[in-house]
């Protein structure tokens, strides 16, 4: 058997030797080389050049070594392979270096520079050798240049700025070591020009270092950059108490918002990029200390807890004032011999500010309808109470319906309901006409607002919290800091959170929302006590007290704080709807509350109101996903916006006394014919018409703006529609209140003035624009700025502080605006 197998073995050995002779080199040239010397040599498939370098490595001094290679022959054949063999690492690269871009584009680089990874040494000092092998499979000679040099500025120092140049084939990285007592630093990299696009990476001191465009994202933290980048680094994340700052220029600029270069038609043809060099500066500075975190949290708590203290002081003052008022009333009642009782400011004086007005009176009203509508006598339809008696509450008979209608006119609630078309279509209405329903029924109706929004909050918030935690986990695991749009120059991490300060600043919404709920609870308790003791002012005077919408508003403010904090865990394009959803809720609830004040019986139910808000949020999601540059979407949305505006205008103008059915167009034509063609008659409800015309002008203008401009930030555009309508209605309400002869008391007046000022400052900080997800992450970082408050909070944090205070103040305005009517009979309070 052995004799038979021997010829085959000899044949196999001969075959291997022949292959080695063809594939392997015949000559190996090994030479001792020196630093800072340029070697110009040739290599081919028959020759391998090996350069031997040695240098002294010390424990306390880190020295960088850089290898520069330039191939002088421009050939498309076999490239040169450079292999650097070190004690604990091997680096290999080919020249010309080919890097891939999008769509597998090829970019070729003749000149390549690489920094060698320096493994740490345990000895005090030792001599280390490394070898540079140069080989190729090209049969012809290829000339190249080789130079190995030391890097004197390889180690970065705290507070010292260092500038350098880099290209895609000549990446740079530097080492930073944490000084004693420093637990966190921020690495800032800047450049005077935006392009070429570059990548900044923070990697642990390990070999190999990933410093090429095609592998820089494999490890560590990284972010793209145009002119500005910043990464906060914590000592606890690096066991060696040091890290590498890696700077890589990308082959293409699309990741930074740039355009793709021209690509040749020849298949697989390399692209000549020309001179894509970028000059950058790196600065490592100490980040904030733990004392800054403590002071930031104490400052945040101090600001908003002071509102609690101020509320307690005002409550004590109001309690003292009420006790004093009660005592004076008791003294007056105990001294009837004085001839005339003491008249209090909050009682019904004979010369009240409402005397002399007859807003909305009818001419020639028969005696049978005197109880239904207050008569003004001689046909003067101007505002005022001329010729009207203004009897004290105590002298009027109580009616369960709390209206200006005499009990003899209506027998049952069913009769009243059957006459809605008569009551609600009068030319001039009073609150008593729209406050006929049972108080207990209305109370339950408006409490549903609170319970519904609480349920919505739970079901909406839980998946949001889960999602943003997942986003933060992905950022921490992958190191990709382009996922979230922070203000990286003022992003202070805590635990797993990357920007704790942006989350902390939302605490104001939660604390002030809770405070508003406590204020509403106290008001409701006081009102219920007044009802229990049959206080006639509570029963028959002022705007009917329904607190359900106020509870819903306070809950919405708290949820806005929670969801805004969730959004700022990882702010980006897809998460922004979390920040705006409850803003839509707040705007809608405020408008409903304004309408409810004068229309308590005909306000929208909680189910229909939240259904409409759900439709708004639905369109918000559609706009975020499909609205960017989509003309068809904007056409459909603008049409729906205009139709919804017209339907709501009709509903408000006719107080709900109209029907949307098949005969609607016939009725519209009939009204146009009778009121516009046969005779030109003005609108029956002038004030409502003025409001609705202004509202339609604004909404049609916003619809036209959206259709023409098609803004990228659809969620903010939708929010602007809600805010504009709310401000319009708010201004109309205040103007009509003053026009009706009503007054604004001191506390709501102060709230209006202070809230307006705070809103002005808040909007100033909001429009600073520290980041924007409408651009690429690299472009967004160009807007980043340093902290401006306590070295801990930035402009957007101040927006959170001020806007939460402004929203709280706006809620207080809604709560106290009609306090001057608390002693005015409801049949003397106008509806507008």
From Swiss-Prot:
Residues spanning the signal sequence: 1-18
InterPro entries in alphabetical order: SID1_TM_fam
UniProt key word DNA damage: no
UniProt-annotated location(s): Lysosome membrane; Cell membrane
PTM annotation: Glycosylated.
Pfam families listed in its UniProt record: SID-1_RNA_chan
Topological domain spans for side Cytoplasmic: 318-447, 521-546, 627-631, 710-715, 768-796
Keyword annotations of the record: Cell membrane, DNA-binding, Glycoprotein, Lysosome, Membrane, Phosphoprotein, RNA-binding, Signal, Transmembrane, Transmembrane helix, Transport
Residues carrying sugar: 27, 54, 60, 123, 141, 165, 476, 496, 572, 603
Residue ranges annotated as Extracellular topological domain: 19-296, 469-499, 568-605, 653-688, 737-746, 818-832
A GO MF label: AP-2 adaptor complex binding
Summary of the function given for this chain in its UniProt record: Mediates the translocation of RNA and DNA across the lysosomal membrane during RNA and DNA autophagy (RDA), a process in which RNA or DNA is directly imported into lysosomes in an ATP-dependent manner, and degraded. Involved in the uptake of single-stranded oligonucleotides by living cells, a process called gymnosis. In vitro, mediates the uptake of linear DNA more efficiently than that of circular DNA, but exhibits similar uptake efficacy toward RNA and DNA. Binds long double-stranded RNA (dsRNA) (500 - 700 base pairs), but not dsRNA shorter than 100 bp.
Designated name of the protein: SID1 transmembrane family member 2
Gene field: SIDT2
